[in-house]
Amino acid sequence: MTDREKFMEVVELYGRKMYEVSAGLGMSAQTLYNKLGNVSDFTASEMSRFKDMFPEVSDETFQEIFFAKELAVKANE
């Protein structure tokens, strides 16, 4: 599961617009919002592109965004 809030924090911190992020990830804005809503998952190549777009993001934050275990546990409760 993806942590939408952390994803958005990174985007805002670096002053990016969602349309810029979606284009950089190679998808439409609607597809990005679907992935952030956990309708579908980010692929490995999309996650890699995110890391390329935001190289300053720590590995820990990257893991928290794309492998949000706490959200997965809450969703199953």
Map each language-model feature to its residues.
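Short acidic alpha-helix initiation/capping motifs at coil-to-helix transition points
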Residues: 1, 40-45
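A short, Lys/Arg-rich alpha-helix, primarily the initiator
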Residues: 1-20, 24
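DNA-binding alpha-helical recognition surfaces that contact promoter or target DNA
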Residues: 9, 34, 52, 64
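Short, charged recognition helix plus adjacent turn
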Residues: 15, 60-77
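Recognition helix of helix-turn-helix/homeodomain-like DNA-binding domains
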Residues: 27-42
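DNA major-groove recognition helix of helix-turn-helix/homeodomain DNA-binding modules
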Residues: 45-61
